[in-house]
Amino acid sequence: MLDVVPWSAVLSQHFGLEVSSGSTRGLLLRLAALLHDVAKPQTKAIDDSGRMRFLGHAKAGAAITANILERLRFSGKEIKLVETMVRHHLRPGQMSDNELPSHRAIYRYFRDTGGAGIDVLFLSLADHLATRGRHLNLAEWQKHGKMVEYVLAQHFERESLVIPLKLVDGHDLINIFGMSPGPRIGEILEAVREAQAAGELTSREEAISYIRERLATEEVVY
């Protein structure tokens, strides 16, 4: 069963890294596994079909986890890592339906999970096993493992998915397109990074054309 879980020397090194105070990523992953569903009692609800739901338990659990670890005098780095794992533990299963996740989805995943992206993937595997228990569907488990393996491969082999090279910056948007400083510039630059991760943009010229078309479309819609 565990042969489905991807593993390598690089991953072993990752989970052996010390975060602070002697605690490693592997240790904090275990702590996140212990706490990831801590908010289920507070968020429990029964829907119209009679099915039990725990809407918002990941977000609520992250806040509870942070509070618990603060009271236990964990360091800021430790708290941030564990809180992030708890907050996003459902995210890997939401990246795609029946197919492997797109490059755009993988980029967004690592953007949102920050330095905890790898850790969250393994928490999702542990959660899958714990949730199904003896009712585990082997085909679904293998599918989950394949997805995690694919996302990890893209992460390690395609650095541009995690940190795309800068093709344009805020000064370009101001000088070329006459935009005013503000949040809109950040939104446009993030859209460019996503398009890069998806393989749609590979050069500065393509990025400028992409922005020009996007702004023109927005003007028409407006």
Predicted feature descriptions by range:
Residues 121-130, 172:
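A basic, often C-terminal nucleic-acid-binding module that engages the phosphate backbone, implemented
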Residues 67-71, 131-222:
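Charged substrate- and nucleic-acid-binding regions of tRNA-handling and nucleotidyl-transfer enzymes
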Residues 1-125, 136, 222:
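Conserved, hydrophobic alpha-helical core segments of structured domains
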